[in-house]
Amino acid sequence: MTMGGTEKNVENKQYRLPREVKEALQAIASEWEDVIDSKALQVIPLKGAMTNEVFQIKWPTREKGPSRKVLVRIYGEGVEIFFDREDEIRTFEFMSKHGHGPLLLGRFGNGRIEEFLHARTLSACDLRDPEISGRIATRMKEFHGLEMPGAKKALLWDRLRNWLTACKRLASPEEAKSFRLDVMEMEINMLEKSLFDNDENIGFCHNDLQYGNIMMDEETKAITIIDYEYSCYNPVAYDIANHFCEMAADYHTETPHIMDYSKYPGVEERQRFLKTYMSYSDEKPSDTMVKKLLEDVEKYTLASHLIWGLWGIISEHVNEIDFDYMEYARQRFEQYWLTKPRLLAASEHK
């Protein structure tokens, strides 16, 4: 899970970038005539990242003009368990070429340099704003319609099984028992059987659409979806379900790992989002169509809880970022077991 950041109020001298990163940054800045000194860069760490270290880099310009800015992303340790970095970079480049994200300005051994988008990273409360939520719905529909290279095959179930294998390898016997990892393969099989539908809509999904991965231009109100580490083809109902689950999160509090499921969107809010989503580029959806998608989305929240629960366990063992991954995992699994009986009642005999 990656996050768009907010600036920390710190002295930049506390944060030293590797030499190869500085050299790459200086090479980029030397191409800009308005930069006074390519070596006079300011490093501002961005708060909230849980997979990578992210920094805003600024240079002063002549005649007191606006600073030149770029974004540096240093990849987190152990993330190759979650996704293939080369696949993610290819997705990033594809998105850039098709106007769906920042430009790739440079690469170095364990990271890259991106265009700094002059837009605001959304906050948790923005997701509840009807106007902003509607814009997210339409942008999401566009995203799902992207024709990406490769087979149009859902990867959700393979990813769940692969992450479960990693969990079993990394977790202590006590952790495995606490999280009931011994029954998880059976749960994944049951979910796939209950949720899979030959007629379901498969699209290119972000799979991590929380507020920190959404930016909005304050003037045009245009929405940009960023950070594609987990992006792949999947049921679109799953991607929407995951977005709804993220409304229970606020990663910029003193307890960023705590989820508040009282903030999960109500039926009317979910229906409004889905109607906007389905209306974009299509005819007005019937009530029956909206109801069907709503039911599918609700069931796919179970897959969201499982996958991010597994992610939390793995991250505890491979990631050094200051975040209570185990408590986060516990909450996601708890929500899975709590909601499963109600959500699968109608399909348990499928």
UniProtKB/Swiss-Prot annotation:
Q: Has keyword Ligase?
A: no
Q: List the GO molecular function terms.
A: ATP binding; choline kinase activity
Name of a matching Pfam family: Choline_kinase
> InterPro entries given for it?
Kinase-like_dom_sf
The highest taxon in the source lineage is Eukaryota
Could you say which EC number(s) this protein's record lists? 2.7.1.32
Q: In which pathway does it act?
A: Phospholipid metabolism; phosphatidylcholine biosynthesis; phosphocholine from choline: step 1/1
Q: What is this protein called?
A: Probable choline kinase 2
Query: Lineage in the entry?
Result: Eukaryota, Viridiplantae, Streptophyta, Embryophyta, Tracheophyta
